[in-house]
Amino acid sequence: GNGGNGGNVPSGAADGGAGGDARLIGNGGDGGSVGAAPTGIGNGGNGGNGGWLYGDGGSGGSTLQGFSDGGTGGNAGMFGDGGNGGFSFFDGNGGDGGTGGTLIGNGGDGGNSVQTDGFLRGHGGDGGNAVGLIGNGGAGGAGSAGTGVFAPGGGSGGNGGNGALLVGNGGAGGSGGPTQIPSVAVPVTGAGGTGGNGGTAGLIGNGGNGGAAGVSGDGTPGTGGNGGYAQLIGDGGDGGPGDSGGPGGSGGTGGTLAGQNGSPGG
């Protein structure tokens, strides 16, 4: 059977409930989400773990509260995928993705950090690792968009998760957050967030691509994320592009037996 979902918080300063764990076969429950306008601190609940033999991890809960983080995705069992991390809407970090199955399975994707009101630059959650023999790493979440003057600049993207031990690609790094939103007439100063780094591949597989730097509203240079490297057979990930003349990320190294190096970011 599956684990139960964590309770949601419709409003107020409280954390969402954690999702329940499955036992032998079944998926973990999703973490509870926190809603309403930001009136306090309330983190998204963590996802439950999948069953020991087979089952996906539950997704982390999301939050609309300020200074609060999205929940972490649950870990998979022997076979299954890790849960995705929850997003954070104001001044908080996206939740990390859960790990893939201990034999076969993909890591969960990291949650996004949507925007900052100017106090904290939230970063995207890191993608979960594939910890078994076969599976891909999860993608990193996007960094927060800068909308305030107290902490100028966008948030950094999350790093991609690593591929499985034998066969698997590294996850892509998340993109950095911008400092100019189309609906905002006056650009916010500062560089866009740094792109996340791509994950490392398994023995066979490609490294993840680095995330792009966020777009700056005033032309401040921003940096792209580095591409992940391959190990034995596979191509290195491409570096993420920089912004406003900032450096792109370096390309990852190709496999020692066969593979090409990733291209540097422009």
Q: Residues of each region from the PLM?
A:
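Glycine-centric low-complexity repeats
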Residues: G1-G266
